[in-house]
Amino acid sequence: MKLISWNIDSLNAALTSDSARAKLSQEVLQTLVAENADIIAIQETKLSAKGPTKKHVEILEELFPGYENTWRSSQEPARKGYAGTMFLYKKELTPTISFPEIGAPSTMDLEGRIITLEFDAFFVTQVYTPNAGDGLKRLEERQVWDAKYAEYLAELDKEKPVLATGDYNVAHNEIDLANPASNRRSPGFTDEERAGFTNLLATGFTDTFRHVHGDVPERYTWWAQRSKTSKINNTGWRIDYWLTSNRIADKVTKSDMIDSGARQDHTPIVLEIDL
């Protein structure tokens, strides 16, 4: 089975805009088409509460014929056109779909951050983890989120093995970002967020990239758009993950990044597993 995850940073822009950045996103989408994955998880869709428009659906069906889609968008009183997730999956797959709420603080449960697909023998779940925010203003809420999310995955894992993916908004260890020393109190590399991810893994999950590749350095999934040279210089962060229940980690045959060319921000990640 092949699965892909990508924080797209606006599905609407990627599908309908003709800006230079959107064209780069469209090139990445063509790369994903060629990958012919069974399941594609997409984060930060930024769609309205009504979800994809008719035009969005038409373009998706043109790009990905033979795929169903399911989505969850941010709902009031949460911010409009914010966060949001989507799955594309091949039509021969017939998952049971759920949109879990985990008892998160503030409006986090209404921001469209988690979708779970249940199959006979396993779960596939994606997450767009809340950012701790400028000035770490959301860090306390983020810590609650991390604990609640870990509990949620552990509950799934009691039923059957889990494949979990998404933008976790944390570089777990120093090897997972280019400049750890200068980012100690940056969102995504605070001690608190790193401890939250350690706790998540400790509930019974494996970071599949490290499982496959060991301590290979300078491999990242995100490069800041604010710096024009972040990708050229590879000053990146690894904040997107494919996790599996420990008991199926040895079934993973590939866990890697997909090249997204000159496009900064997130790059897609791929998992291949014998299930």
Curated annotation (Swiss-Prot):
Against CDD domains, the record matches this protein to: Ape1-like_AP-endo
Q: Where is the active site?
A: Y128, D167 (proton donor/acceptor)
- The site feature described as Interaction with DNA substrate is recorded at H266
> Which positions are annotated as binding Mg(2+) 2?
D167, N169
Marked site, Important for catalytic activity, at: D240
List its EC numbers.
3.1.11.2
Q: Where in the cell is it found?
A: Cytoplasm
For this chain, one GO molecular function annotation is:
DNA-(apurinic or apyrimidinic site) endonuclease activity
Tell me, what is an example of a GO biological process annotation in this record? base-excision repair
Using the UniProt record, give the first listed, main subcellular location: cytoplasm
**Mind telling me which residues the site (Transition state stabilizer) is annotated on?**
N169
- Cofactor, free-text remark: Probably binds two magnesium or manganese ions per subunit.
- Top enzyme class of this protein? hydrolase
Which Pfam family is one of those matched by this entry?
Exo_endo_phos
Binding of Mg(2+) 1 occurs at D9, E44, D265
Name the UniProt key words of this record, in alphabetical order. Cytoplasm, Exonuclease, Hydrolase, Magnesium, Metal-binding, Nuclease
Question: According to its UniProt record, which cofactors does this protein need?
Answer: Mg(2+); Mn(2+)
Function, in words: In addition to 3'- to 5'-exonuclease and 3'-phosphatase activities, ExoA was shown to make single-strand breaks at apurinic sites in DNA.
| Protein name per UniProt | Exodeoxyribonuclease
